[in-house]
């Protein structure tokens, strides 16, 4: 019998991406504290959060658990997820006209073997200079 595949995410985009593979899966969102540890670099942070999400979902379901976390690194600092619309405006203004790195940590956890398979992917982005009006219309 094949193990069930579990997506440890509430992200509609991640759900859509996995659905495009044609695999049958169950969604078991995991809510964890997503704060960076003191002096933790962005790559280790993204992988740690992805692994913690997978482990949290493994408390509810068995199988192959897929979890991911994406962060932005700007000038060696982690840019957190926006807390609200005002914060989203602040973050996009901060990124406007600058180079930054988008880092996704992926963790696949096999609950039967208690084994992780991980990968970290970096995308280098140069954002155009955006006006406040452009940023507001995007948000």
Task: Pin down the residues of each PLM region.
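Anionic-ligand binding patches
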Residues: 2-4, 41-139
């Amino acid at each position: 019998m094949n193990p069930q595949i579990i997506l440890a995410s509430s992200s509609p985009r991640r759900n859509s991406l996995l659905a495009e593979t044609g695999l049958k899966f169950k969604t078991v969102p995991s809510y964890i504290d997503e704060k960076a540890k003191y002096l933790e670099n962005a790559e280790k942070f993204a992988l740690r959060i992805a692994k913690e999400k997978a482990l949290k979902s493994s408390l509810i379901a068995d199988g192959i658990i897929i979890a991911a976390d994406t962060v932005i690194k700007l000038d060696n600092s982690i840019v957190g997820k926006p807390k609200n619309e005002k914060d989203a405006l602040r973050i996009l203004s901060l990124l406007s006209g600058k180079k930054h790195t988008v880092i996704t940590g992926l963790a696949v956890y096999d609950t039967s073997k208690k084994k992780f398979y991980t990968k970290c992917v970096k995308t280098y982005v140069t954002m155009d200079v955006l006006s406040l009006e452009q940023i507001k219309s995007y948000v």
